[in-house]
Amino acid sequence: IQACLVQSVFSQCTSRAAIAADRGIIGGYGLGAPCGLGYGLEAPYGWAGYADYGYPAGAYGIDAYGGIGEGNVAVAGELPVAGTTAVAGQVPIMGAVKFGGDVCAAGSVSIAGKCACGCGEGYGYGLGSPYLY
């Protein structure tokens, strides 16, 4: 179920080669490129720059999944998950997340970004910016 959820959300496969390739996420035109995170979060061309997500980022492979619509995910029973799940891109969530019953988990979760409600407020974790990337 988790694999189907990640595949349907991102509609693409991000391999190690795609991440480290010359034009991948950390390659010559990726996050560490001159117009990406390499110049800092609040630099003129960083993620907090022009369009909040880097002015030229969409043209070089940093883009949302592009899906539209609304969906519900229901899980009944046990869902054993082991290993590491790496997600690159944006996860647009608008609405509420609700859990019923006991949810036992071990490990760590890191969530960064800004809300999708349109208020323009970030999570406020510092770094000189209301956004944490």
UniProtKB/Swiss-Prot annotation:
GO cellular component: egg chorion
Signal peptide (UniProt feature, chain positions): none
Superkingdom, taxonomy of origin: Eukaryota
GO function term, MF aspect, one: structural constituent of egg chorion
Family (UniProt): Belongs to the chorion protein family.
Protein role: This protein is one of many from the eggshell of the gypsy moth.
Protein name, per record: Chorion class A proteins Ld24
Organism for this UniProt entry: Lymantria dispar (Gypsy moth)
